[in-house]
Amino acid sequence: MRKLKVILKIGKGDKSMKLIMRADDLGFSEAVNLGIYKAVKEGVITSVGMMTNMEHANHGYELVKDFDIALGQHTNICAGRPLTDPKLIPSLVQENGEFCSSRELGKWIGENG
């Protein structure tokens, strides 16, 4: 397992805490990707969550792939298109095959328990 860079250590001895900075939503848009890339390049971010189903996922990956970071899956069921066949998850997608928004999902859960 990759050792993450500690950005800040707070407290002393047994009561100390370490802060590791993580960025989420890599792949959401080119603007988000570039912001995360800048933070990774400057050493502020050492852990990144990637939205693999989003249109700009490949762009984001190409920006950060050569850095020594922890790159993880950001599970996403409320934006973009699913990686699986939308017909298999009809309660999660709209007619156009894209995921329902979090607001729509919340409404559906409220109505259907």
Regions found by a protein language model. Give the residues of each.
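A short alpha/beta connector and helix-capping loop motif
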Residues: E30-E55
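Structural preference for beta-strand elements that scaffold enzyme active sites
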Residues: K18-I20, I45-G49, D68-H74
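Acidic (Asp/Glu)-rich catalytic clusters
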Residues: I36-E42, N58-A70, K87-G97
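Non-cysteine beta-strand/loop elements that form the S-adenosyl-L-methionine
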Residues: A70-I77, N96, C100-S102
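Active-site mouth loops of central-metabolism enzymes
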Residues: K18-S29, W108-G113
